[in-house]
Structure formats: C-alpha cells, structure tokens
C-alpha cells in the first residue's frame, strides 16, 4: 500500500543556500507534529551547520522526509524540483541516524561531479563523506580502512560499483550489514520508463531486498512523471511514503523563438548573447554543433567554451569551475553537462535545438535560477530537430534476436567471455552490447564474473509488449516537445503538466503569459558571420590502426595492428551528418528513400575547397597527410548512390586535373550487414568483397606507386574504406587518401 502525499513548496527568493534550506524569513512552517520535537531541533541545528546560516529553516516537505527516515524508518520517495534541497534531507538524516548509533549511509549516485560537490558540502556540516568511483581508485584502500574503523558517515558509490564482482563479493555484504540508511539519488534512472534509464540501477532493487526491514531507504528525483513514480515505488517495496512537490519554477522566464534556419539562430546568439543576464549554458543537440557554435562565438569576442562528451575530463572540470566563478559568459554544451552541475546563480539557459523530451528539457532548464529571483530560458528550435532525434534514437531495450544471440554465445562458451571477445560472436556494437548485458544481468540471465560474462542458464523471457510500449512512449515525448513549441498557453504550466504535477498553473512570466520578453531581431553582420561558419567544410577522417579482436572466428585472417604497407592514410570528410552547416544537406541526400542524383555543384566546390586546404597542410600534418599530391582518383562503388559517387569523383578529376581511374569492383555480391553492427561484423561483411579489377590494376601500375585519392559517399565504421585502401595498396598504390562526403555521428 503506497502512502501518497503532496507537499506544496514555498516559492521564495532564495540565496546560495537554496540547495539545502530556506532563509527563516521566507521558509514555510515545519509540518505539524514535527516542530518542537527533539528530532526537529536536532535536524534544524544540522541544517544550519550545513548551509552556514543560523537563520535557515526547512523547505516545506524537507523535515517530513527527514522525520520519516529518522523516526519512522520509512521507505520514502521524494519528487521535488531542482534546487529544493534533496541532498539536505539525506545529509541531515544521516548525521542524526549516526548519532543514534546507526551505521554509515550508503548513497548510490551516477554523478561523479555531484559526488565531488556533495563530499565538500557534507564536510561543512561535519559529515564525514567519502566516495568510491572510477575516478578515485588510488583512494579505495584508504576508504576501506576508514569504513573498517567506523570513521565514515556517508559513502557515495556509483551504480556501476554494484555490478563489479570484486566489490559485490568483498565490500557489499559488510556494507549491507552495517548500512544505517540507503539513498538512491537520481532515482528516475531506476525506471526503464525514465528518460535516463540505467540498467545498473536495477541492481538497487536487489540491494533493497537484502537490507533489514528496519533500515530506512530514501529515493530522490526531480524528473519523474506518474508512470516513473509508480515504477520506483514498486521497486522500493511496500509502505512507501511519496512526497511530491510542485515542479513550477517561479524564477524562470520561459520563451520560444522560431527562426528560419541555423544561420539565423546562430546570428541571434551573436547579436544578443551579451545581453543575457549573468552567465549561463547554451545547449546543442550534437557535439559538432557545440564545437562550431563555441568557435563562432569565441571568434566574435564572447568568453565561451565548448563542453561535450569528447571534452577531456580535466578540461570539463576546469570549464565547470570557470562557469561557477563567472569567468566565462557561457558553456556551449551537449547533454554531457547534465545532472549534478550546480550553480545557484546561473542566469540563463538557451537551447539551440530542442531536447527530445519534456523531462530532459525541464531538467536542463532547471539548472537556471536556483538561487536567483530571475533567470531567462529560451528555446531556439530547428527544423532539423526531429531528424536529429531520430538519428540518435537507439533502442535502450534489447531486441529479442540480439538477446538470444548473446545468451547462445555465452552458453556455448561454457566459461567467462570478455565483452571484447563477445563482439566477435554477436553483431552488436560495444555500447548497446554492454547495455544488453546489464539488462540480462539484472534479470538474472547472465552474471559478471572475473574474466567477463557467463550464462546462468536461467530461463529468460523477452517482454516484447513492454519494450514496444516504452518505444511508443519515446515517440510521444518527442511529440510533446513539438506541442510545447506551438502552444499558445503557459509554457511552464504545459511542462509541469506533462510531468503530472497536479498543482501546475500559469506562471504569469513566460512569453505566452506576459508577452514576448526577448528580442527577435538578428543583426545583418551576425547573420553573415554565422553563414560563414556554417559554410565551412572539412573535417579529419581518422584511419583505422588496428583490426578488431577475434576475427579468426569470423573467417578473416587478420589480427593486431594494421601493417603500415596495407594501411589507409588519414583522410578528409566534407561534414558529419549531425553538423549544423553541411549536415542538413547531407541528411537530405542520405535520408531513407532519397533519390540518387549527381552531386550538387555547391557541394562539389566545397569538397574542392577541402582538398585545397588538405593539400596545403597545417601545423599538425604535412599536405595530403604526408602522402603527396594524389596521382589518380579511384571510387568505391555505391549500390544506393552510384550517380552521386561517380559525379563527385569525375568532378574532382576535372577540376583538379587528376586522372579518374574508375571504381573498385564489388565481389560476392558486395558488402553485407547494415549500419549499426559492431566493428568485427562490419569488417567481416566487407572482407574480400571490395576488390581491384584487372583494368584498375593495370591503371595503377601506370602511376608507379604514387598516392591515390579514394572517394566514397558515407563513412560509418570506416571498414569499407580500410579494406578498399588495403586492396589498392596491395595492387601497387602508394598512400591511399580517402575523401568522403559524409560521416555518421
């Protein structure tokens, strides 16, 4: 039986203590029955130590949760807006429980950055907090010693630790025996209905079952609709106390500005970024968009940095600190700048393209205005957003066919198989394979052991109906973002209603409630500058250096490093499919069902410009990647775009006055497989299927070992290029220099 209560928040002007509690002058009274008790007095004293404010008091609902944990030993779910102070609940409860003789609190959190911040925050209140995660392995022994000596009040671990065999066998049993409070941070990750589902979180349900019934459990999240809340409640067990607060953010002023194209959107940023309040975040949908936008703004004199999944961890931490210290105007970021980043005075969030779900959007805009009375939030949607959502839409659930293949491969192996070795037996890329293994592990079909994974031989039934419903829910979320852009009603009310907030109401501040608050003009010089950035073409196409492991199992006689005499040189690509500039035109060309036609003259000229710059070289590499000007051009035949490839090769040949020797030949029916398979299977699918024919071999002999330019339309795994380059080199070509129109990703 679920005890479901709604706690309405106090919406007040809050200071830098907003993440923990409110100033006494603005706080709501503590719940009846709590104020005046010994627990309340003790909890309030700890809160004030935590925030360093002798006048601080609880936000509405905070003490109710603390009391449920400390006095009631309850299993409690807190769903409250960002900045409400969920961490204050578990830090205060932890210290009170420790004073009553309980063991240390175990906090499961997916966020390394948040762990750093929380350890520092806990220390301010005398809470001895330590962490075990992938970033501090050198400290693990010290942490174990501190735990053994009972010198730790709070231990933070990543969910991945719970699946580590050594941790599970050597540390977890003792932790379970001694734990005084279990905290599940970002609990929406536990639900496969959630926008950020992580299979490792499903291990927590097993952990909860192993805890003594007297140990309280707290789950916290800011982003959960009713379906996700119900899923979390089921996994917490019976008798859950759910405290749901209002999700509306009075400090945020929302708006949507629809502009004709990417050039205008970037031009708007160039024109108006300096007028936005304080410092903030500009979110983009792709890595290339973040990097291009940051470069454009920096060249115009704005203090900005890019922040993506490709950013070095040390550079990420530095960028976060610069933003916190207001040393930059903005970070131009992908969703890599995610949960756990906290800057109470963040002045604005601008989205250059819409996230694919209202939940993700709410979470990202919720980083603004946590400790300020006002913050601006503006969405600049793009016509290409849905295409990008679709491009990145990867199934977070296992397909029945792939799951069966993994289970069969592990059962046949008999012993543990590493993920790398499994790639040679199952056609799945590393990331989806690891995700599938985690799902199967949580369901008990496989287990992670020393040396890799092995089958438990327990029966496993594929829940096709559930996975289909989840896939449909993802599409509904995308549709909701389109509705958000087009709605004439209050934008905050719409977002919070989608999150099933029963208290959703008109904010009176957004562009639909109070009128357009943002300028819509774009300076002509800014538009021109943006256009120049978008028209830039050319990126490095890195060559494969090593063959995948286990190729002998697939009948391909290669292993280890690719031999230099057979290797492809570094190449060039016009653009990635996700680029803001040429990416749009390329996505149209390669869209499903798109007609094959000769290369557009403007695209051909852009490729020629890329070649000129490649031939000149730069400080990093010599011209033509050190291979010398190509003496001939060869193309890879395309079954779907033959006119495109042939016209591109002939056009470059005519303009560059480089002989076009023709195309390679497809043998045995040509490459097999489809985009998305893993590296080993992709290589096996092209091996010996792209060959040098007799006429081409004779023509290659005539250039006497000089370099060859290799033309292709689309690069994904790069194994077709690698095999084609190897064949050309074995036939007598010197360096093989690939030029590709588009690269996936």
For each predicted feature, which ranges?
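Active-site-facing substrate-recognition patch
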Residues: 252, 531-632, 642, 646, ...
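C-terminal accessory region of SF2 helicases/translocases
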Residues: 328, 350, 354-363, 369-570
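PRPP-dependent phosphoribosyltransferase catalytic core
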Residues: 514, 529, 533, 722-745
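Acidic, metal-coordinating catalytic cores used for nucleic-acid/nucleotide bond scission
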Residues: 287, 311, 637-644
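Active-site signature of alpha/beta-hydrolase-fold catalytic machinery across serine-
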Residues: 92, 96, 231, 647, ...
């Amino acid at each position: 039986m679920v005890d479901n209560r709604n706690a309405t928040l106090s919406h007040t002007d809050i200071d830098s203590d907003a993440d923990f509690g409110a100033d006494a002058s603005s706080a709501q009274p503590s719940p009846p029955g709590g104020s005046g008790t010994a627990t309340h007095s003790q909890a309030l004293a700890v809160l004030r130590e935590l925030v360093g404010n002798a006048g601080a008091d609880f936000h509405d609902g905070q003490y109710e949760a603390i009391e449920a944990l400390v006095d009631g030993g309850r299993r409690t779910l807190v769903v409250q807006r960002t900045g409400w102070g969920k961490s204050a609940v578990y830090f205060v409860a932890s210290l009170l429980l420790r004073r009553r003789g309980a063991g240390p609190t175990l906090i499961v959190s997916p966020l390394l950055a948040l762990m750093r911040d929380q350890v520092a925050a806990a220390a301010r209140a005398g809470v001895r907090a330590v962490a075990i995660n992938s970033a501090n392995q050198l400290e693990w022994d010290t942490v174990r010693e501190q735990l053994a000596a009972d010198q730790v009040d709070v231990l933070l671990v990543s969910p991945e630790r719970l699946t580590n065999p050594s941790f599970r066998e050597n540390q977890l049993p003792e932790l379970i025996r001694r734990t005084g409070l279990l905290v599940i941070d970002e609990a929406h990750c536990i639900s496969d209905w959630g926008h950020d589902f992580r299979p490792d979180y499903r291990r927590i349900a097993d952990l909860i079952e192993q805890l003594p019934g007297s140990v309280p459990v707290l789950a916290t999240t800011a982003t959960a609709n009713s379906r996700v809340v119900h899923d979390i409640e089921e996994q917490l067990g019976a008798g859950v106390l759910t405290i749901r607060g209002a999700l509306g953010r009075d400090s945020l002023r929302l708006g949507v500005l629809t502009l004709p194209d990417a050039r205008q959107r970037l031009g708007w940023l160039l024109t108006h970024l300096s007028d936005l309040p304080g410092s903030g975040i500009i979110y983009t949908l792709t890595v290339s968009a973040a990097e291009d936008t940051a470069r454009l703004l920096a060249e115009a004199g704005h203090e900005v940095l890019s922040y993506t999944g490709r950013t070095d961890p040390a550079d990420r931490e530095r960028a976060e600190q610069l933003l916190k210290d207001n040393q930059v105007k903005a970070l131009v970021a992908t969703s890599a700048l995610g949960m756990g980043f906290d800057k109470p005075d963040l002045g604005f969030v601008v989205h250059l393209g819409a996230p694919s779900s209202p939940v993700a959007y709410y979470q990202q805009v919720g980083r603004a205005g946590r400790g300020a009375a006002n913050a601006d939030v503006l969405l600049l949607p793009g016509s290409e957003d849905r295409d990008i959502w679709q491009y990145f839409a990867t199934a977070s659930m296992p397909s029945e066919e792939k799951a069966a293949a993994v289970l069969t491969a592990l059962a046949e192996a008999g012993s543990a198989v590493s993920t790398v070795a499994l790639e040679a037996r199952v056609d799945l890329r590393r990331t989806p394979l690891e995700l599938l293994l985690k799902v199967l592990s949580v369901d008990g079909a496989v287990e992670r052991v020393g040396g890799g994974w092995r089958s438990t031989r327990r029966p496993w039934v594929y829940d096709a109906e559930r996975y289909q419903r989840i896939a449909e829910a993802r599409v509904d979320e995308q549709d909701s973002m389109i509705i958000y852009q087009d709605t004439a009603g209050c934008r905050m009310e719409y977002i919070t209603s989608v999150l099933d907030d029963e208290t959703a109401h008109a904010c009176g501040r957004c562009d639909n409630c109070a009128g357009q608050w943002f300028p819509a003009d774009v300076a002509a010089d800014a538009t021109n500058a943006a256009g120049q950035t978008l028209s830039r073409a050319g990126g490095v196409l890195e060559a494969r250096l090593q063959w995948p492991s286990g190729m002998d199992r697939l009948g391909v006689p290669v292993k280890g490093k690719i031999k230099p005499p057979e290797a492809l040189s570094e190449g060039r690509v016009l653009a990635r499919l996700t680029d803001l500039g040429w990416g749009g035109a390329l996505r149209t060309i390669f869209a499903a069902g798109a007609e094959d036609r000769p290369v557009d003259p403007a695209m051909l000229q852009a490729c020629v410009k890329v070649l000129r710059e490649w031939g000149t070289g730069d400080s990093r590499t010599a011209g033509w990647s050190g291979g010398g000007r190509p003496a001939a051009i060869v193309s890879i035949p395309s079954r779907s775009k033959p006119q495109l490839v042939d016209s591109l090769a002939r056009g470059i040949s005519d303009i560059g006055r480089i002989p076009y020797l023709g195309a390679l030949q497809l043998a045995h029916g040509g490459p097999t497989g489809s985009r998305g398979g893993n590296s080993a299977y992709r290589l096996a699918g092209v091996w010996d299927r792209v060959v040098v024919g007799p006429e081409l071999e004779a023509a290659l002999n005539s250039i006497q070992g000089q370099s060859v330019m290799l033309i292709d339309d689309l690069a994904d795994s790069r194994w077709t290029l690698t095999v084609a380059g190897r064949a050309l080199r074995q036939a007598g070509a010197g360096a093989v220099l690939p030029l590709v129109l588009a690269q996936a990703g």
